[in-house]
Amino acid sequence: MSQNSSIGKGNQSPPLFDLYEGHQEGSETEATSAAKYPNLFKSETTITDLPELVKLLHKFLETKNVTGLALIARQKGLPPSMRAKVWPLLLRTHPFVLKPYITSDDDDGDDVDGEEEEQEDDLHSSTPDNSTTSSNDTEGSDNEYPSSIPIHRIRSELQRYTIRSNYNKDIIMSLSPQVRQLFEVQEQIFHTIERAVARFLKKWGSIVHYDPGLVWLGLALAEWIPPLPEYSYILCGREHVARNGTKLRDINDDNFQRLYVNDDISSIILNYQSEDAKFSINENKEPSNDKSNKHQKNLSFAELYERMVLVVLHSPEQSDVVETDSMHERTNNILQTIPTKGGSISERVSFFLHCFRHLLPELSNYFSEEDILNGYNNSDEWVIWWLKWGGARAWSRFDRGRVWDYLLGWRNGLPANPNSKTEILRHQEELEEVRSCLDSHTLELLGPDLFWNPLVKEDVDSTKKPEPESCALSRKESLKSMLSTLSLTNNTALEWSSSSVGLDERERQSNHRDTLLQIPYSQIDPHSALVFIAVAFLKSKEFALLELESTEILEFLNKSSSLKFNGFQSLISDPKWDTEDADVRKIMDSYNNSPEDRDVRHLPSSGISYTAEKDSKTNSKGKRAFSPSPPSDLSLTGRYRSQPKRSPRGIENVITEAGELWRKWSWQELVEDN
């Protein structure tokens, strides 16, 4: 990364970094951690660098402790190979799934598929059925769907994913039986995604009209979770093709477990997975603990997809702010409600542009000059793909996977159903297990909530929620009120966390103090966090983007990655690569010429080779840019050929920087006279 994004360093205002009570400079524990994990305090450490957290993750997974899994997922992310096991559990109990709310496309005004409007009468009722699709009901024909569901458009969009394969049926039939079987499995996977999208539209179609983003959400989910329970294949990514010509890779491939993993972590993951032998989302072993009973029913891919869409497209209920025609007061209302509730997609786009202009003024002005932001309301544009669809189609699968770890791990600390005594007891049991596993060292590894804020205490009564009348205040007062609301929400979560049936008042107070230091709950809405992640992503590439022309910028924004090599994308990659052209070329050439680097255990004899482009290119400004364009590092059976430990730290730095930008923005709004 080109900028220093570590907490407490850089050019941020000092008052923002002294407010986290758990951080003490110069402490013995910190010194020990810094010596053992030199990158921890440089915002570069991922969970795959921390064996302690990986072991803790496995413990929570064995007991199906969703509270612990969510904590690790949002704070440090998940090892890529573990997402297929953890994401289904997080999706079961996500607050946006248990209490879904989606704003109608008609209200957002960003749906460009006008044909769907005339089809609305034929779709399902406007009040969706709360029953869940049966896992046994994954097979079916087109006749089971209303004729208004655009199956042909869904299939057409799915074909875009395989455009780089360039294989037709005649070529496929000429291949070996093993390869033909893989293509048949690939076709079944696409049919499964197609049915998942169609069933979602059948259930929610009166609210959510068809959009290509729905298809790409399904494809993105299939890049981490096997869509077919009888197979362990996932999709390898939009930009990658396996050597045999498919878009598949085997989740049981040992190389997959070692991706971005050091030797210690690799042995931990492999030992854990050897207990389950071959992976299947329908073969997860259920623990004997009674509290896991609610997780006994396995979810089909269609059910997981529906829950994923509910999380990504979640929009809050209409806020209770005072309606006004004043642009100034409307801006203040948005500033107060967006961080706490997220807002509709149109509000989030407006908030993103506001933050972009204030936090990255030079790049924002350059984008305006190059007409990059024109037409952002069109659902085909990059801003919508980033903010509304959670990076589907636009971000690399590894960057998107880490961001989705945060989205799915988001929790406010409250029980899933505060009115259910059973749910409260389950929440308390999980919380007690989490607290029993957390010591000071583990807490340091997890760190505070990524979006902790400088609590504003002066002139604010944090014991009560702001009255609606207080919303029409100055911008500074609006921010104070908003931060007070965040503080109040956090205190409410702590009260739930520290209260247990059968504890006396003294024990409850002790638990409250312990939990304050132990559990870093989410403090801002996850879709608001996504806004700052988007700004941080742009900041990480700011200097390179300022050197590109509009067409190159748009190409990058629509196919973004924290580590990219193709063509002008080499300018966007980590600066270290600029001095390693010869070394990178040597690595690539040695790989292509080294037979021992080809794992042929399952590769059919007539497999199709994937050839990487290694030519140097010249960008539009006449600058020579090395383009190693690594071959399919996600191939079905081959070894990985890109530098494995750089990409995850790239997106980890982006997310850490997003928290810094959130604090910088809130500080600017508080101290500057706007």
From Swiss-Prot:
Residues 104-121 have a biased composition (Acidic residues). The keyword RNA-binding does not apply. It is found in: Cytoplasm. GO terms for cellular component: cytoplasm. Keywords: Cytoplasm. Residues 1-14 have a biased composition (Polar residues). Residues 125-138 have a biased composition (Low complexity). Belongs to the OCA5 family. This is Oxidant-induced cell-cycle arrest protein 5. It comes from Komagataella phaffii (strain GS115 / ATCC 20864).
